[in-house]
Amino acid sequence: MNSKICELLDIEFPLVAFTHCRDVVVAVSKAGGCGVLGAVGMTPEQLEEELKWIDDHIDGLPYGVDVLIPNKMADKDKKFDAEKLTSMIPQEYADFRADILEKHDIEANELRTIKTAATYMAENTKADGAKALLDVAFSHPIKIIANALGVPPDWMVQMGKDNNVKVAALLGTAQHAINQVKAGVDILVVSGTEAGGHCGSVSTMVLIPEVHQAIQPYGDVPILAAGGIA
């Protein structure tokens, strides 16, 4: 199947799958798509371990890494630590989680705790933490680096260009798409509200043609549809 996405990423099918599981990354890429590993909840050392495993099992096929760098936070040193993130979680969520663990006889210490993941996320959404993850990612033969929240910082886009890696970014409105293209993003991940609503409230099937029309004056930038896509 021939498309610009296939040409850019050197894949057989224009299918890109985000996952937190390295095994899924490998499986998707071996099936002709491009697996993308979510890294925001990892330390640089953990990411290195995961990517080394992928390199050893993926037979040289294309894959990518996804980070989460809110543009408004990327160059700021605001205190946004694990305690603050954890305090935002409703008690109902914590109770639901505890109930599931109890029903299935799972010890909480067998899982990565919310607090630990929140600690990494708080660090990795700031410039220093994000750059540390990107340094690890770009030391491996990735084909795509994606930002899952907003326009990537200029330095992230430049790191992609310097390493000959395509930069993708999620968006939820036509204006978001224009902002991303102007920032130099190579691939637009158009994420409708069916993806969980984190990018906006517009339905995927409405958003895709809106974005396609909006970016026409800015060049031929490929679009990946996300949200309600099975």
Regions found by a protein language model. Name each.
Residues S191, V221-A230:
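Glycine-rich adenosine-cofactor-binding loop
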Residues M1-G219:
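Active-site entrance/lid segments in N-terminal catalytic domains of soluble metabolic enzymes
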